[in-house]
UniProtKB/Swiss-Prot annotation:
It comes from Bacillus subtilis (strain 168). The keyword Translocase does not apply. Keywords: Cell membrane, Membrane, Transmembrane, Transmembrane helix. It is a multi-pass membrane protein. This is Uncharacterized membrane protein YjbE. The keyword Membrane applies. It comes from the Bacteria. The chain crosses the membrane at residues 9-29, 42-62, 67-87, 107-127, 134-154, 159-179, 192-212. It holds the Pfam family TerC. It is found in: Cell membrane. One of its GO terms (cellular component) is plasma membrane. PANTHER family: MEMBRANE BOUND PREDICTED REDOX MODULATOR (PTHR30238), SLL1022 PROTEIN (PTHR30238:SF4). Belongs to the TerC family.
């Protein structure tokens, strides 16, 4: 029994760590323009709100999958988020600090909400009804998310072009969510090329659209 518990725990921790890497990218990108103190607040608050929300999502995992086009809507949101983070201006003096902070937290939480959909289903299955496994797995992933986002922020400061890689990751994840939506499964099964190419095309679309916007704004 203990052996099965440990195996399930390792599986859940692995799932949470994989998602934690994606979360760290989103957190670093969403908070990169904030002053140091507010960035720390955004990282900590955003992480803990997202983790608490994911615990609730895991409890409702089965019901979530029955909502029509939820994954598709989440995928489209991630495309928008990837685009928005690319065109975001660093000069935010006209925005109140508190507004910027809560906007960053909102971005982190919403991105986590949609990016977690697939993972909470996997976690719910791996936990076999042991809710303690869900909580332990998420607690283990928290330091990874927090420290990972700080390291990614440092990398973004040194190599600004990495923002395109981060947005590309969001776009690709969004494209994958769209093609995996249950309501679109029949169409995707009949058009295998679309299923393969769509995530790649969404990356190209988001990056090219942001470059076009920046050229127009000059």
């Amino acid at each position: 029994m203990e052996h099965d518990y440990l195996i399930s725990l390792l599986v859940i921790v692995g799932i949470d760590l994989i998602l934690g890497g994606d979360n760290a990218v989103v957190i670093a990108m969403a908070s990169r323009h904030l002053p140091d103190k507010q960035r720390q607040q955004a990282i900590i608050l955003g992480t803990f709100i997202a983790v608490a929300m994911r615990i609730g999502l895991t409890s409702a995992a089965v019901y979530l999958l029955n909502i029509p086009f939820l994954q598709c809507a989440g995928g489209i949101f991630l495309l928008y988020l990837g685009y928005q983070l690319l065109i975001e201006k660093k000069d935010t003096k006209h925005i109140k600090s508190s507004t910027s902070l809560w906007r960053a937290i909102r971005t982190i939480v919403l991105a986590d909400l949609f990016m977690s959909l697939d993972n909470v289903i996997a976690v719910a299955g791996a936990s076999h009804g042991e809710f303690s496994l869900v909580v332990i797995g998420l607690c283990v992933s928290v330091p990874v998310i927090i420290w990972g986002s700080k390291l990614i922020h440092i990398a973004l400061e040194k190599i600004p072009l990495l923002i395109y890689a981060g947005s590309g990751l969001l776009a690709y994840t969004g494209g994958e969510m769209i093609v995996r939506d249950k309501k679109l499964s029949l169409f995707m099964a009949q058009h295998g090329t679309v299923e393969t190419l769509l995530p790649i095309l969404t990356v190209a679309f988001v990056i090219l659209a942001s470059i076009y916007y920046q050229q127009v704004e000059k």
